[in-house]
């Protein structure tokens, strides 16, 4: 098969012929139908993920058709169209037995702990736990984005953030997961504020559902601007991941609000406005993806017409574009989401 392989971090990515994967016990092999380019893939190539061992194939946000089934798999047959979460749970540990596969103690992550979907084929581990059937009405392009950005934003905004109709949601960072968070807010009937420093990203946020867009460069105090416009957010999400955006997210909340942290910080330790958390009895909530057992809720939103992930897509690529497109993500050259649809 063809795969986009890098031999070292920050090194060249080459489209080369490698052996087709074989299904281990419990796994299925899928032929990739579409795969998203996510900033996490860029960070992996850049060398910031300790789980990656070179040579490596990234790509963790995909939809595929089952072409081979490993021993012990009972739920899947060749020809089934499936997605999988980027965190694949073992199905047997304590968190998995509670249905919280996204914090599995033995988790596998295609594109990180094992080769991923920037290839013509990949494997889904623990397939009876992690593979999810895609409804016929959902396109390959839309389904691929459910594996990471859309499901992660659902977990953050709907499940962890508990956003309700009529509340105010503030989203810091309008990249892929931020745009998905904006769309989630619109889907549940919230007032959505989008914050970024790129006008084209803010324009795209408006097109997918934000009611208010704020360019942080235009405000000395962006949190004060959020309060002036809305009275303060009930839920605020840091989708970028640094001390400034996290602090601004917290300061944008009204009393008893919920801060959701999705973006990863550059370092493990960072300053954080704990005094405000204590004073206003705020909640601080982490997000590490969505359990496969909850994907049906996301698909239900899509089938109802309330959520359309393809509205975020601005580039459709071929697998042969990955060697140049992945390193280019570091330049933040274009807004929206890129999806490989030709393999």
Model-derived regions, located:
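C-terminal hydrophobic helical "lid"/dimerization subdomain
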Residues: 1, 247-250, 292-343
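Glycine-rich beta-strand-centered segment in the early N-terminal region that forms part
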Residues: 21-35, 48-94, 135-137
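Short glycine-centered segments of the SAM/dcSAM-binding site in methyltransferase folds
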Residues: 81, 168, 235, 257-259, ...
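Mid-domain Rossmann-like dinucleotide-binding core that forms the NAD(H)/NADP(H) cofactor-binding site
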Residues: 138-218, 224
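Glycine-rich phosphate-binding loop and adjacent beta-alpha segment
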Residues: 243-306, 342-343
């Amino acid at each position: 098969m063809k795969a986009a392989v890098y031999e070292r971090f920050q090194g060249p990515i080459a489209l080369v012929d490698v052996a087709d994967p074989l299904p281990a016990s419990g796994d299925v092999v899928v032929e990739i139908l579409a795969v998203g380019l996510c900033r996490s893939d860029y960070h992996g190539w850049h060398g910031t993920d300790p789980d990656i061992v070179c040579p490596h194939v990234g790509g963790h946000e995909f939809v595929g058709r089952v072409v081979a089934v490993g021993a012990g798999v009972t739920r899947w047959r060749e020809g089934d169209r499936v997605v999988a979460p980027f965190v694949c749970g073992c199905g047997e540990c304590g968190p998995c037995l509670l249905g919280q596969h996204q914090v599995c103690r033995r988790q596998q992550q295609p594109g990180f702990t094992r080769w991923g979907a920037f290839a013509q084929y990949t494997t889904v581990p623990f397939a009876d736990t992690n593979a999810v059937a895609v409804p016929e009405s959902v396109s390959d392009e839309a389904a691929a984005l459910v594996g990471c950005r859309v499901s992660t934003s659902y977990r953050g905004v709907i499940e962890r953030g508990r956003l309700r109709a009529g509340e105010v949601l503030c989203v810091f960072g309008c990249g892929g997961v931020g745009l998905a968070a904006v769309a989630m807010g619109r889907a549940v009937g919230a007032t959505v504020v989008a914050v970024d420093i790129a006008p084209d990203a803010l324009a795209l946020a408006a097109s997918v559902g934000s009611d208010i867009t704020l360019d942080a460069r235009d405000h000395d105090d962006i949190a004060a601007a959020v309060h002036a416009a809305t009275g303060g957010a009930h839920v605020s999400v840091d989708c970028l991941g640094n001390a400034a955006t996290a602090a601004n997210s917290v300061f944008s909340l009204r009393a008893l609000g919920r801060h959701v942290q999705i973006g990863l910080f550059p370092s493990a330790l960072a300053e954080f406005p704990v005094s405000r958390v204590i004073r206003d009895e705020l909640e601080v909530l982490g997000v590490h993806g969505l359990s496969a057992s909850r994907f049906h809720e996301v698909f239900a939103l899509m089938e109802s017409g309330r959520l359309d992930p393809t509205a975020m897509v601005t580039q459709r690529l071929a697998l042969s574009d990955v060697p140049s497109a992945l390193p280019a993500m570091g330049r933040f050259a274009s807004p929206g989401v890129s999806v490989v649809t030709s393999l």
